[in-house]
């Protein structure tokens, strides 16, 4: 895919993923992207192990997998709220220039399990480092208005869910 933004300039991206046709337990996906303006490579890699044998993807019901991912990319502050990938052809079109962006390093470990009775557990651990880029600055709220070079966060999450009798619809395709 070819897109553009304030920091990357013209951006070239190539993505790929495996399915259960390669291995019914191990799944890999990722991308590499290069910006002509900042001349930096960006990338993401994800490895998922499904504890149950999958027909096509690791997120088939009932899910039971562990996943690890690492990403280095440039993002606008709003990109983390997107339900889809920021390089989606419809999201990549902007009506105004977004010049406040950041380089993000994000390492995530995720576990998810669903049962046939409607109970599910999801756990997540994340370490993230945001370094401002473009016209974005992180400024400490002190008298000197100190410029902060980056913001590093760590996050843990646990979700328990019980939805007895829940039904799912899916589209089945011959692949």
Language-model features, listed with the residues they occupy:
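Transmembrane beta-strand segments of outer-membrane beta-barrel domains in Gram-negative
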Residues: 1-8, 15, 71-73, 77-175
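Transmembrane beta-strand segments that form the barrel wall of outer-membrane beta-barrel proteins
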Residues: 1-6, 13-15, 20, 24-38, ...
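Feature captures outer-membrane beta-barrel proteins of Gram-negative bacteria and organelles
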Residues: 12-20, 36-58, 67-69, 109-113, ...
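Short loop/turn motifs that connect adjacent beta-strands in outer-membrane beta-barrel proteins
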Residues: 22-26, 52-64, 117-123, 166-174
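Composition- and surface-driven signal marking solvent-exposed, interaction-prone regions
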Residues: 27-33, 43-46, 124-126, 137-139
């Amino acid at each position: 895919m070819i897109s553009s933004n304030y920091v990357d300039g013209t951006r070239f991206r190539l993505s790929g993923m495996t399915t259960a046709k390669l291995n019914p337990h191990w799944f890999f996906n990722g991308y590499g992207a290069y910006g002509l303006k900042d001349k930096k490579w960006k990338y993401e890699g994800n490895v998922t192990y499904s504890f149950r044998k999958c027909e096509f993807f690791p997120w088939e019901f009932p899910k039971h997998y562990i996943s690890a991912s690492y990403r280095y990319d440039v993002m606008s502050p709003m990109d983390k709220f997107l339900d889809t990938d920021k390089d989606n052809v419809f999201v990549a079109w902007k009506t105004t220039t977004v010049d406040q962006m950041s380089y993000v390093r994000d390492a995530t470990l995720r576990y998810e399990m669903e049962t046939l009775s409607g109970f599910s557990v999801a756990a997540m651990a994340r370490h993230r480092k945001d370094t401002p880029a473009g016209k974005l600055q992180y400024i400490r709220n002190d008298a000197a208005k100190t410029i902060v070079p980056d913001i590093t966060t760590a996050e843990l999450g646990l979700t328990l869910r019980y939805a007895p009798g829940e039904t799912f619809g899916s589209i089945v395709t011959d692949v």
